[in-house]
Amino acid sequence: MKVVVQRVKEASVTNDTLNNQIKKGYCLLVGIGQNSTEQDADVIAKKIANARLFEDDNNKLNFNIQQMNGEILSVSQFTLYADVKKGNRPGFSNSKNPDQAVKIYEYFNDALRAYGLTVKTGEFGTHMNVSINNDGPVTIIYESQDGKIQ
């Protein structure tokens, strides 16, 4: 499982039936790979909930999202598992099939909520317009395999 965390001043995701937005917090781009499990979702959710990605008065990254009253916008993105080894068109066979991936994606979002975080989401498996106003920028990539951070 791969999650790209971007610290944002604001972010939104929209399509014909959806309009979710947050102010200060994280925009998460969430990729579910063939071997991703609920254990991977748990360890990444814990890391994100406790990650100190906001500055204190000395410009040190010392505050987590809860301490800053931030929100999370979680957007599924199967393209994080693109295979670009051959040719010019990416392949996506490394991504988990959608029926299984959506369950892990929803589980991951619920795991974040279990830490008391406000989590808004995109719509799994649909085309969306994502707007991200990065803050910093601060971008961290979390990856887990077999329930362990890589």
UniProtKB/Swiss-Prot annotation:
<keyword id="KW-0963">Cytoplasm</keyword>
<comment type="similarity">
    <text>Belongs to the DTD family.</text>
</comment>
<protein>
    <recommendedName>
        <fullName>D-aminoacyl-tRNA deacylase</fullName>
        <ecNumber>3.1.1.96</ecNumber>
    </recommendedName>
</protein>
<comment type="function">
    <text>An aminoacyl-tRNA editing enzyme that deacylates mischarged D-aminoacyl-tRNAs. Also deacylates mischarged glycyl-tRNA(Ala), protecting cells against glycine mischarging by AlaRS. Acts via tRNA-based rather than protein-based catalysis; rejects L-amino acids rather than detecting D-amino acids in the active site. By recycling D-aminoacyl-tRNA to D-amino acids and free tRNA molecules, this enzyme counteracts the toxicity associated with the formation of D-aminoacyl-tRNA entities in vivo and helps enforce protein L-homochirality.</text>
</comment>
<keyword id="KW-0694">RNA-binding</keyword>
<dbReference type="GO" id="GO:0106026">
    <property type="term" value="F:Gly-tRNA(Ala) deacylase activity"/>
</dbReference>
<keyword id="KW-0378">Hydrolase</keyword>
<dbReference type="GO" id="GO:0000049">
    <property type="term" value="F:tRNA binding"/>
</dbReference>
<comment type="subunit">
    <text>Homodimer.</text>
</comment>
<feature type="short sequence motif" description="Gly-cisPro motif, important for rejection of L-amino acids">
    <location>
        <begin position="136"/>
        <end position="137"/>
    </location>
</feature>
<keyword id="KW-0820">tRNA-binding</keyword>
<dbReference type="InterPro" id="IPR023509">
    <property type="entry name" value="DTD-like_sf"/>
</dbReference>
<dbReference type="Pfam" id="PF02580">
    <property type="entry name" value="Tyr_Deacylase"/>
</dbReference>
<dbReference type="InterPro" id="IPR003732">
    <property type="entry name" value="Daa-tRNA_deacyls_DTD"/>
</dbReference>
<dbReference type="GO" id="GO:0006399">
    <property type="term" value="P:tRNA metabolic process"/>
</dbReference>
<dbReference type="GO" id="GO:0051500">
    <property type="term" value="F:D-tyrosyl-tRNA(Tyr) deacylase activity"/>
</dbReference>
<dbReference type="GO" id="GO:0005737">
    <property type="term" value="C:cytoplasm"/>
</dbReference>
<dbReference type="GO" id="GO:0043908">
    <property type="term" value="F:Ser(Gly)-tRNA(Ala) hydrolase activity"/>
</dbReference>
<dbReference type="GO" id="GO:0019478">
    <property type="term" value="P:D-amino acid catabolic process"/>
</dbReference>
